[in-house]
Amino acid sequence: TEKVTEYDKNGNIKKLQRYGQTGASSYGLVDNLTYTYNGNKITRVDDAVTATSYTGGTNFINGASTNNEYTYDANGNLTKDLNKGISNIQYNLLNLPSVVTFSDGSTITYTYTHDGKKLRTVHVIGGVTTTTDYCGNVIYENGTPKRLLTDEGYVDLSTATPTYYYYLKDHQGNNRAVVNASASV
């Protein structure tokens, strides 16, 4: 769970606490975050909790401790996120990310149609290239069909027997969870 404990005068979250699993059978504070802004643009996040959460946890990892952990271009697009190891983000004419470069040299390159629909994503990690193509409602990975998208969810085509997954939506139509046919999340 999350609890906002303070906002700034612009309505931005200034302090946030997250609670989650801290051990095999224990729960507690996993994040005690303080946000710093320049106007409405976040520039820094600090976490007063130094212990990492339980395996598989979702706590914030403070990957940098500088005054400008996040930087932006003239259009307000994020160009650097040191906490996630992102050293540079380039944008196309539609202000959509075209190339994301990480501090370890990995890259993600995006290709879009003229109206901004994503056609391809290319990940280069440790010299290994993975190409994902988005063709209508089918997602291909390195030329092999991996997912068939539907309004209700998707079909995982990466195994010998296709597996169906369904979206659970809230009252506003937002996806809140994805479950399989056995209702496992």
Regions picked out by a protein language model, each given a short descriptive name:
Residues 49-66, 150-159:
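Surface-exposed acidic, glycine/proline-enriched linker/cap segments
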Residues 1-59, 115-117, 122-124, 130-138:
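Conserved catalytic cores of ATP-dependent inositol ring kinases
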Residues 137-141, 153-156:
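Short polybasic amphipathic segments
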Residues 134, 143, 148-149:
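Extended, non-globular alpha-helical segments
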Residues 1-15, 69-131, 155-185:
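Residue-level markers of secondary-structure register and packing in elongated scaffolds
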Residues 36-39, 64-66, 128, 148-149:
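A short, polar/charged loop/turn motif at coil->beta-strand junctions and beta-hairpin connectors
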